[in-house]
Amino acid sequence: MLSIYKEEMVWNTVKDKIATLFQLPAISQWTYPQFSQSIPVMEKKGYLAKNDQSLHLLNSKNSYLIGFTSGTSGTLKRCLYKMSGDVYNVKECEEYNIFCSTDTCANLFTINLLFSAHCLFSNVASACGANIISIGDFNVLASEHFDALIDVNTNVLIGIPCEIIQFIQVMQKKEKLLAINKVIFAGEALKAYQREIIKNTFGNDVHIIGAYACSEAGIIAFSLGEDNNSYELLTNQFFIERYQDRLLITSLDNMNVIPLLRYNLGDSADISLKGNIIRLTNIKRNNISFNFMGYIIEYETIVAVVHKFHPADISIQIHLSVAKDTREVITVWVPTGIFSPQQIKLLEKELTEIPDIYESKQLNQGYLVVNEVDPIQYIRSVRGKILYIVDNRD
């Protein structure tokens, strides 16, 4: 039976690990309220400060995978992942049978600028005994490429949902079919229409696994059942809390290069407990950022570009949708009567040049448009406030 998660329920099982990892022995004697009142929340700014302090590690005997994230949503964050010794997340992936020796995986993660997910997933999968094939640019895949994938019995797809769908579309255009029995997605939620495409293509028995992750922590939870909106927390690695409707995580082992102590993920979720299993459902980003093709884009990033054309404060609403060809669309609503038709075109062009949006357009995965709309028609909350972001993608 599911019960509402309360931090006090699991505190006694994690406090000694936290005390040891962070060299704070007093924590072993604390109650959970003492912990939450005594240890401050670690925000992005605090993480970045520790990030700067980690540079000396690059001259140590260990090797690291170096990635940079969130370039369009604020300060470029450097993320380090251990490449020597125990490989990150391997024990959990083996325990949950995410990867195994019979897997031949097509890695669909786009090899983007300074992007680490491609190498990270390959590293974890290979450490579990799986075979890895890096796919690269979908736009140049030919029939012989699919024949080569069939020859080596490719049976697993790994990637962001939109990349998985794009790969399927190219495969179908070439009139080829891989015998895929497992699909592993990360980077964003799997939408209902995407799940339907995967099932219709590879059959109802295909196993779909979601990885809930962030660049600072790596993989935090897996969705293993039919409901890919319900995630099982990796309780051997993380202690989770709720703070002002946000999720906080604390590392329980030293696999994170920068251990996290009450780190604010910025996401919200419902948390429940079933035996020793902690489940996360209805995971949502905060309402001033959105996930577009696996990238987190801040509302303020869009606003800053609009203000170049009109410095005064105006209401801007962002609508997210899916086109008939399954490409994702960002539609930026601006008030009528402020911009000339020429300015609208220039604004649309500059917004499209935001790196992650531009890349999605170049890869034919998504695009952006600007529409003039009377603010009276803007979508509002039940309290009558104009919403920053309206997500109609599912």
Where are these regions (language model features)?
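Active-site phosphate/ATP/adenylate-binding loop shared across adenylate-forming ligases
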Residues: 47-176, 182, 186, 191-197, ...
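Nucleotide 5′-phosphate-binding alpha/beta core
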Residues: 1-96, 100-102, 331-333, 337-394
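Active-site glycine/GP-rich loop and adjacent strand/helix microenvironment
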Residues: 2-13, 134-394
